[in-house]
């Protein structure tokens, strides 16, 4: 029954690892429960209502992933996408948050249509195999950078853009301890090393004043202030088209990048680098975004933190089911879950980033025609703070280098350019030129 419902294979998987994987994924992405209300409330949305809708939309989308796609990936309102929603569409362009929610709804409906027609899968297949292999290490660097930043180990600098943080602060010291502890547990091959590291680091943070414990149970705030709040009279404006297309580009290629990267790490791809049941995963993403807009939150997407659950042993829909259950529990135990500091989850993000670098061995950097675009893809993800920008620039550079060097065919035919790859590059160039 478990195999039919969730794709659980008892010959290669264990319930313990699936549950640990799901809990680990939740703990590494639980920060969104604090961050999303903070960002979206800047638009005038009710922060308490946003907290509740963040949980509910994550539950619904992740359950679709568990039952329909049967994959160990979890979803929630996406970082970056929520910032674009609040700080660009509302605070910069001057539109209401209801206008932004309408754009998210339209994007979700378009995604459902693209998924049903199979067009999203064709877009994935248009990305050359070698670039798909570069996505995983690029994401690894990106989430490691996010972990270092959230821990305070690195910080912004006007002189050098980024520099070391205060290595004497309790938070940074706690994070470095968590990294060393978790790394040691991983070296010893302790099952659930990431989860154990997070929990121990959180507990040690209490006397240091880093872990802020403020209670256990609270009643979930009502979603009424933001539920089904749309603004229809502006849907045919040029700005609405631009906003919808921007949401589409960012969400599509963040999701594609995350699915390919995490699936490569989990060994859930075929010889041609194609992700298992990717179309079903796309549907979970599309449904999550559509339902999220109805509830009152920004675009829902697959979380790169799913890699932490995969590395903890999660391989089936049971992992994402566990994460969904954790989000339900979080509705009732918000103060308890929100007590986990970013310094505790930083170790998981950084070490998962290390693990995801494994795929880089499949990229031949001595072949400059493919090596340079892969380098561009990998390095731009952390430097632009965007998975999608890394993929887009990687594809553009791949096509241009092939064209200018006259190398239209690769020694591996799976890396050959075709009309779809060239069309993608043209669309990406237009995206940067006009959006």
Where are these regions (language model features)?
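Helix-loop-helix junctions within the multi-pass membrane cores of secondary transporters/permeases
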Residues: 2-36, 57, 78-87, 91-136, ...
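Hydrophobic/aromatic residues within the transmembrane alpha-helices of Major Facilitator Superfamily
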Residues: 23-30, 60-63, 67, 148, ...
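Hydrophobic alpha-helical transmembrane bundles of multi-pass membrane proteins
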Residues: 24-25, 33, 49-54, 135-139, ...
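Loop-to-helix transition at the N-terminal end of transmembrane alpha-helices
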Residues: 43-63
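Juxtamembrane transmembrane-helix boundary signature
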Residues: 59-79, 110
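Membrane-embedded alpha-helical modules
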Residues: 93-207, 211, 321-435
